[in-house]
Each structure stands twice: as structure tokens, then as C-alpha cells.
Amino acid sequence: MRPLLGLLALALASPPVVALAQEPAPAPRRTQLTLDLGFVDASGNSNVTSFNLGEKLSWQLERLTLGQTAKALYGEAEGKPTAEAYDAGLRADYALGKTISVFALGTFQRNPFAGIAERWGVGPGIAVGLVRSARDTLSVEGALTAQRERSTANVRQSFAATRTAASFKHLFATATAFTQTLEWLANLDTMDDQRVTSETALTAPLSKQIALRVSYLIRFDNLPEPGFVKTDRLLTTGAQISF
């Protein structure tokens, strides 16, 4: 009887190690939605209104990842438009291994102030993760795309192009994130038609769902539409909301 009472007392005094070990780990998030919002409205000696909106949605199921992005920028001064640009994209990635995946993407761009009425791109590609650590990630990718575009002067053209891109992300100890993306699009029919897009961003969290984001976007077109300059620069600040 005494041995049984001793075992019972030991069981009651011991911490529930077995129960804790059997608790299931939280399931990874399959769907993620991020919104970027920025707005400026000034009146008085100058009347200026501008807003920028960014949206990114991703859904993951085992090896397949589906993504959708959208961006909008609009600005006006003294009642007249001074900036207008829209971007959208769809992408599907399929992981072949831990660091290699194949993908298919489709993109849309409209920027009347750069002479672009519409620009479409679609094609397959391959992505390779070069660095994957707790704080740093670096990946590169290449794709062969079909491009179709129409200028604001109603000039149409279609061509094949290569797409080369790189993406880097660094997490600081405070969970602040620095990201850098670079994309190079090369026309296979006209060698002088080279386009480079670079975006540098810094995101500082205020809570689990809300953060402040500052980004600097550079778009270079070596062969712009007649009457337009080669380089566009855009600095945006605003709030980022994650769901």
C-alpha cells in the first residue's frame, strides 16, 4: 500500500511533461494578405492629393504556392492629374526541392505619364534560393516571357524577352525588415530595349499586424516612348497591414 501511495504522490507532484510534449505545433499559415496604404492631401497655398495602394495575397498548399499582387498610384495638383500608375501580377510556384522551384507568371502595367497605355507579360521560369537563414534570404530567377504592349500614341508591338530577377531580405533584431528587389527585362528582338526595375524598402513593425513602410522605386527604360525620359523614381511612405 505504501509503494502505491508513494507513486501517486510522485505523479501529482511531477509537472505534466508528457502532456506538454504531446501538444500539436501550430499549423503554418497557408493564406497571407498584406496591404500597403499611403495618402497625402494638402490644401491652402497649394492643393495636392496623392495616394498609393499595394496588395499582396499568397496561398500555399504543400509544394504549390499561388500569389497575386496589385499596386496603384494616383496624384493630382491644383485639380490636374500629375501621376497615375497601375501594376498587377499573378504567379504560381511549384517547389522541386528545398531551394529550386519552377514558376509561371503574368504581369500587367499601365503608366500614362510614361507613355504606356498597357503592357502585358507572361511566361515560365525557374527560381533558385541561394541563401536561406534565420535572418537573411537571397534568391535569383530567370524566365522567358512573351510581351505585348500599346503606347498612349496607340503604337502596338509584341516581342519575346528574357526576365532576370533577384530578391534579398534581411531581418534585424527588432523585427525590422530590409528588402531589395531587382528585375531586368531584355527584348530579344531589339537589343537596345532594356528595362530595369529596382525597389528598396524598409518595414518597421508597430504591432503584430501593423507596420510602417518606406520604399524607393526606380524604373529605367533604355528605349522609352518618344517624348518621355528614361528613368522614373518614386518614394512612398505609409502603413502596412498584414492579415
Predicted stretch roles:
Residues 39-43, 61, 72-76, 108-112, ...:
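Transmembrane beta-strands of outer-membrane beta-barrel pores
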Residues 25-66:
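Short glycine/proline- and aromatic-enriched beta-strand/turn motifs that initiate or cap beta-hairpins
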Residues 1-30:
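Cleavable N-terminal export/targeting peptides
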Residues 37-39, 55, 68-72, 88-90, ...:
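Transmembrane beta-barrel strands of outer-membrane/channel proteins
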Residues 202-205, 231-243:
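Outer-membrane beta-barrel "beta-signal"
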Residues 31, 63-68, 99-102, 134-138, ...:
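Repeated loop/turn-to-beta-strand initiation elements of outer-membrane beta-barrel proteins
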Residues 31, 47-51, 82-86, 118-122, ...:
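Residues that define the transmembrane beta-barrel architecture of outer-membrane proteins
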Residues 23, 59-63, 91-98, 127-132, ...:
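Outer-membrane beta-barrel proteins
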